[in-house]
Amino acid sequence: MAREHPHIVIAIDGPAASGKSSVARALGRKLRYVYVNTGAMYRAVAWLALEKGVPPLDAGRVQQLLHFTEFVCDVRAGESTILLDGIDPAPHLVSAGVNASVSAIASIPDVRRLLTKKQRAFAFDYDVVMEGRDIGSAVFPETPYKFYIDASAEVRARRRANQGLQDSIAARDTQDSTRRTSPLVIAEDAHVIDSSNLTIEGVVGEIFGRLKLKGLPLGEL
């Protein structure tokens, strides 16, 4: 696919608790690119559905709810932000209800189409580090800068527990990798990094080195 946008996109994908969010945020700061957390967008829709009493598995009602909601994506302090009818959902995005609902929300094709459009729009205005589960495979398949961050199931479960989250890593992996629309996959040309025994700085350093090898102009960084 030819690049339709004027800015650089670094795609970082991976399963839950692989460390991709922390890595993507740190890389964005190092490069002075905008950090975009696409998972937060799906979590925002899950929160909205729960707030309005709409079952996350009811695709038709979720789509209708989104149709009548002002969903605004913007950038503040170098990171993506979300407003739903003027309300910032950020404080609610890691609740137990949202954790239990987000995979169902992410499996709704019309939701993915809407959010993919919003995600691609960032690259018309900014150089971005964008993380999620289908950035390199579906949202920006044309970018040459693709990374897949993974870790062992044991390490990922421990990280979730340290975050105060008790949801099942195995169940979430199954949901994400078997959904019909944009499942979690490793993009064919992605560079895979196992973060199990690496610090955030170590993963960022490996990505940085790979970007240099790919010829990304990094200036004096």
Predicted regions and their residues:
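ATP-dependent NMP and nucleoside kinases share a basic, alpha-helical "lid"
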Residues: 90-162
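Walker A (P-loop) phosphate-binding loop of P-loop NTPases
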Residues: 17
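Extreme N-terminal, non-catalytic leader segments
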Residues: 1-9
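Conserved lysine of the Walker
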Residues: 20
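Hydrophobic anchor at the beta1->P-loop junction of P-loop NTPases
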Residues: 12
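N-terminal phosphate/diphosphate-binding loop that engages ATP/GTP or pyrophosphate donors
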Residues: 29-95
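Hydrophobic positions on the alpha1 helix immediately C-terminal to the Walker A/P-loop
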Residues: 23
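Small-molecule kinase domains that catalyze NTP-dependent phosphoryl transfer to phosphate-bearing small molecules
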Residues: 74, 119-126, 133-142, 162-208
